[in-house]
Regions:
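TM-lumen/periplasm interface segments of multi-pass membrane proteins
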Residues: 2-107
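Short acidic/glycine- and proline-prone juxtamembrane loop motifs at membrane-interface regions
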Residues: 130-138
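Hydrophobic core segments of transmembrane alpha-helices in multi-pass, intramembrane catalytic enzymes
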Residues: 96, 137-146, 168
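Aromatic-anchored segments of alpha-helical transmembrane domains
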Residues: 5, 121-128
Length: 169
């Protein structure tokens, strides 16, 4: 956890880079949040696309995600796009680690020695790299479903609450 925190601090404090890895999808959510802060409609296609281009995207794309899907990007909107993109990568990376650990605990509880191998394989598995590289929010519903399964397996009474909170996102 210390190494993860140190990596996060280094990523945030390093020099900004143009919109690139981790920002192609995330910039849509970030631009939508910016429009909301300005009191504008995040689904105004012209305004959203113009802002996305201004933020570094080569071309704008329409925002089709439902409003509640913007919640994970909400805390990042006050940061510069470069910092917000980096933190989004860190948040998605942390979600991947937690999801992997939960699935490993559910299906291989007697083989904890597999966890380092599973975590290392995340860096080589294309879907993991794609989610991190685009800045998608698709890990949030997976985290909700995984949390619900894990909570049910543990016999927690609030398993449905975990699912509800994260699936709404």
């Amino acid at each position: 956890m210390f190494a993860f925190s140190l990596l996060t601090a280094l990523m945030i404090s390093s020099e900004p880079v143009p919109l690139g890895w981790g920002g192609s999808d995330f910039v849509q959510y970030y631009a939508a949040q910016q429009l909301i802060l300005e009191g504008k409609n995040p689904y105004d296609r012209q305004a959203a696309e113009a802002l996305q281009i201004q933020l570094g995207r080569s071309g704008g794309v329409a925002m089709f995600a439902p409003p509640w899907s913007l919640l994970p990007s909400r805390p990042l909107v006050r940061l510069r796009i470069e910092e917000a993109t980096r933190l989004n990568i860190v948040m998605n990376g942390l979600l991947l680690v937690l999801i992997t650990a939960a699935w490993q605990a559910m299906f291989f509880p007697d083989r904890l020695s597999l966890l380092p191998l599973l975590l290392a394989s995340l860096l080589l598995w294309y879907p993991s790299l794609a989610v991190l590289g685009m800045g998608q929010l698709s890990l949030w519903p997976l985290a909700g479903f995984t949390g619900w399964l894990y909570a049910r397996q543990q016999g927690w009474n609030l398993a449905g609450a975990v699912l509800l909170v994260l699936l709404v996102i």
